[in-house]
A protein has these predicted regions:
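Short alpha-helical segment of the dimerization/phosphotransfer core of two-component systems
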Residues: 29-34
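Conserved micro-motifs of the catalytic ATP-binding
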Residues: 49-54, 88, 92-95
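A conserved beta-strand-to-alpha-helix junction within the catalytic ATP-binding
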Residues: 55-70, 83
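Short conserved segments within the C-terminal catalytic ATPase subdomain
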Residues: 75-84
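Short helix-loop "hinge" at the ATP-lid/N-box region of the Bergerat-fold HATPase_c
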Residues: 111-112
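Short conserved segment of the HATPase_c
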Residues: 143-155
Length: 208
């Protein structure tokens, strides 16, 4: 939405029809994602278990990943670099594109939030007949062994953070797990303190 506000304040940008169309599409993409995310968080806070409503459709995963990366908000004081890798001729994925985008946004946001000033984020997509594998790796603070299972629990926040003022309520990874499992997929985590974190999501091609 910051892109849209900047656009409204820039007269020259508003005169460019192609730019206008792109900014409007990006803004609608972000609004749809925000609406779905807030709705899911409300469900998670208000109920212990509630069925996740998915609206699956076929979409280009590479295009979605690249859009999420492009629209990522980089906080002041952070220098963030991305690298991405995709298989050639990857078929469309049938899943809920809004929730998948939010899952990826959560992982990227965590990678930025729980890292130092210079952040390196690697996003790798693999594809086979069983499904798609999406991995997000970073060079952040890492997670202590005794906390690796707990980080997917609702409202859990690490006690090993070097900066106790990092904002958050502990719902991001809980949301990630719930959405992935609603797609009949799985999520796994590998991490070492001081060496970063790698989170891998597997979604079956025949899940929906």
């Amino acid at each position: 939405m910051k892109v849209f506000v900047s656009f409204l304040n820039d007269r020259e940008m508003r005169m460019d029809e192609a730019t206008t169309e792109r900014v409007l599409q990006d803004s609608m993409f972000e609004l749809d994602n925000l609406s779905a995310y807030l709705g899911k968080l409300k469900d998670m806070v208000c109920a212990d278990e509630r069925e996740t409503l998915l609206r699956p459709s076929a979409f280009n995963l590479r295009e979605l990943v690249e859009k999420v990366v492009r629209l990522t908000n980089i906080p002041a004081g952070k220098k963030v670099s991305f690298s991405t890798a995709f298989p050639p001729d990857m078929p469309d994925l049938t899943a809920d594109p809004v929730h998948v985008a939010n899952v990826l946004s959560n992982l990227i946001e965590n990678a930025i939030k729980y890292s130092g000033e210079e952040v390196n984020i690697d996003i790798v997509v693999l594809w086979n007949q069983q499904g798609v594998e999406l991995t997000v790796s970073d060079n952040g603070f890492g997670i202590a062994p005794d906390e690796r299972r707990k980080v997917f629990e609702k409202f859990y926040r690490s006690s090993h953070l070097p900066d106790k003022q990092i904002p958050g309520i502990g719902l991001g990874l809980s949301y990630v797990r719930q959405i992935v499992e609603a797609h009949h997929g799985s999520v796994s985590l590998r991490s070492e303190l001081g060496e970063g974190t790698r989170i891998t999501i597997n979604l079956p091609t025949t899940a929906l």
